[in-house]
Amino acid sequence: EIEFTRTMHGIMRNISHFCSRTKSRTWGKDGWQKIVVCVIADGRQNVHPRTLNALAAMGVYQDGIAKNEVNSKEVTAHVYEYTTQVSLDETLKFKGAEKGTVPCQDVFCLKEKNKKKLNSHRWFFNAFGRALTPNVCILLDVGTKPDSKALYHLWKAFDQDSNVAGAAGEIKADKGKGWMGLLNPLVAS
């Protein structure tokens, strides 16, 4: 759940940044209404229970509802929707409006079976992409912690040039507190 909350809290900090852009014609205080976060878990037996607990604490997931089959037909996936007003940071502390957190529209897709990453991407683009018709999609792996303005800068690349079809952000190693992560040769390199 640490990796998940690191990523999710980073996304929510980015949404707060979009909402702080009061002079923008696109964003502003209600900018969160233009953003939907889709979380796709690859297999009900594979997702860590503490990650589900983190999603439940945010109001996005409800335990005990998912069934293997309905009307004698196998279930492919379980979809939960919720607009949360709290975030869990990577230390598992709640952050709300008093800490600058804005609401976040979430869709959580819990796939019944592990069908791997490419299948999850198909779910995202073919199911949720068709339903939501987004202008910009940003894919993040769990554990990635976006800087507080990173998603804005990615969005801006698309906004400024309609010929842009794809963009990639810069990935930096997390150096840790007091840069202690640099003692690890993989991080230091």
Swiss-Prot record:
<comment type="similarity">
    <text>Belongs to the chitin synthase family. Class II subfamily.</text>
</comment>
<dbReference type="GO" id="GO:0004100">
    <property type="term" value="F:chitin synthase activity"/>
</dbReference>
<dbReference type="InterPro" id="IPR004835">
    <property type="entry name" value="Chitin_synth"/>
</dbReference>
<dbReference type="Pfam" id="PF01644">
    <property type="entry name" value="Chitin_synth_1"/>
</dbReference>
<keyword id="KW-0808">Transferase</keyword>
<keyword id="KW-1003">Cell membrane</keyword>
<protein>
    <recommendedName>
        <fullName>Chitin synthase 2</fullName>
        <ecNumber>2.4.1.16</ecNumber>
    </recommendedName>
</protein>
<comment type="function">
    <text>Polymerizes chitin, a structural polymer of the cell wall and septum, by transferring the sugar moiety of UDP-GlcNAc to the non-reducing end of the growing chitin polymer.</text>
</comment>
<dbReference type="GO" id="GO:0006031">
    <property type="term" value="P:chitin biosynthetic process"/>
</dbReference>
<keyword id="KW-0812">Transmembrane</keyword>
<keyword id="KW-0328">Glycosyltransferase</keyword>
<dbReference type="InterPro" id="IPR004834">
    <property type="entry name" value="Chitin_synth_fun"/>
</dbReference>
<dbReference type="GO" id="GO:0005886">
    <property type="term" value="C:plasma membrane"/>
</dbReference>
<dbReference type="GO" id="GO:0030428">
    <property type="term" value="C:cell septum"/>
</dbReference>
<keyword id="KW-0961">Cell wall biogenesis/degradation</keyword>
<dbReference type="GO" id="GO:0071555">
    <property type="term" value="P:cell wall organization"/>
</dbReference>
<keyword id="KW-0472">Membrane</keyword>
